[in-house]
């Protein structure tokens, strides 16, 4: 099953791209709610390069790593990556109100489509 989320960021494409691909920026926005945060992020932004984000509950009760491998990069336009046996694509589309950031990803069987869409959308909305 394919799930898509998107948001519009009122900034120029170069700033949006940098914020999406720079570890120092990722730790600022990559959280689904105020009680979670990203404590560390790594990015090797090239095809075959890897990325990871350590996401933790602020109370220390739980955490997990989100990691994958970049499979295609078109600067300022598109990022494709694999994470486990799933894939995702991120599109950056400049428009009159800013840049639309659209993420399409393969869902997983553990959580409902609504839960997955809601979680990914909440993270993207922080961007």
What label would you give each PLM region?
Residues 77-122, 127:
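Beta-strand/loop substructures that line and gate deep hydrophobic ligand-binding cavities in soluble
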